[in-house]
Amino acid sequence: MRKISNVVLCLTAVAGIWWGGPLLLQTWTARQQINEACGGLVPAVPVLALSPAGGTISHRQSDSGTIQLEADLPQHCELFSTEAGEKHGTSSGERWFFTGAVGALPSKTPVTPEDSQDRLLDPYGDPTYPPEPLGGGIVGTVSDSGVTVELPCSDGRANGKPVKKLWARASLTEPGRPFSEKGQLFSSDRNALADIAVRTLNNLAEHAGCTDRLPDAPTDIPALTAGPEGAAHANGTCEWYRKKDFAGDEKLPDQVLESRTDNRLWDERCGLVLGEERAHRLWESVAADRRHSTVHPPSSIGEWYVSLHTYAGEGAENVQLDSIGYDEPPVEPEPGTAGRGDESMWWASSVCAGKPQIHTMTVSYGYDKVIPPERAEKLFRAYVTDVASRRSCTDTQFPASSAFHTD
């Protein structure tokens, strides 16, 4: 009887090796592909746990899609899978599904808010999900496609150059319906991407010789909140708008697109949107005025809006706004200054905890022709004052009232 049992166990083991061997080889090969593409910075195990990571994993065969540790930052790596290819029905049988990116600050990369013809909302009426703070004691954000984190590093060097901060991003590439739910990532993918971003940044910090490390990523990251919503419900980055009851003015937005506040973030935004009915009522009220004869009625949801940003720290030094003249270089706001970019962009500045902050306002095309200048100024001042108070900022500089008038 014992001999029979031993034979059965041996046969079972052989069968396990027979069936498991190809899977083990596929996993080993996938890990090799991830390490080769991402310079050993991106942890392979949580990447392979992502929803689109099934099947065969490969990476882009070019310098622009691989991380090379001895080259300048920023860099990124791009991974492909047959699982993503099959679900999306690609002709090649594979599809780009993951991007890991790393970088350092200070950087010369321009930071640009929306211009007047950009859209804040999905033009087809689907929900819009503004990024939220990551939480967990980590300076970072969660978007509808990935997670970005940041770490101070005053004692490190990247490719021989001193740095002040490092950052890392882990994201899915246009996950779409096969790998998302109602326009959002699956909860398991949000958590995995946060883990990947944090571990990638810690690996980069070790390579750069930084002393500090990030704590473990949160393990139960909440879903993003869909927007826009009525201004009466604002309790985050647009709470100031509700408290001032600006929405009671028919010429101002009645909806908000906001996130939770986090005073440590490099970019914090409040979006103010005119709902479809209010936008059309406002257009009808000015359509007969010859001064507004070139203003067309809004043709899509959320087309008329005001977007407000606060850029902090190193990022504030790289803000660029469109200039009034088409042939002129971009306007580069500096700490201690305030003014106007093109006809629909303004900036203010302040100093918070010894670090520069640049505050910007963009008014969308069309709406910039009908919003009264004094109301635009009042909005911007109220926004900047709120942020400055919340962040204990000083030396706040506002644009002159004349900067809000076009004539």
Region annotations inferred by a language model:
Residues 21-113, 212-291, 374, 388-407:
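Extracytoplasmic low-complexity, Pro/Thr/Ser/Ala/Gly-rich segments
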Residues 2-23:
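Hydrophobic membrane-insertion alpha-helices, especially the h-region
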Residues 16-17, 26, 94, 165, ...:
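Short, low-complexity intrinsically disordered segments
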Residues 130-210, 315-407:
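A short, solvent-exposed beta-edge/loop patch
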Residues 260-347:
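Flexible, solvent-exposed loop/hinge segments that line or gate ligand/substrate-binding clefts
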Residues 106-136:
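Long acidic/polar interaction regions in large eukaryotic complex-forming proteins
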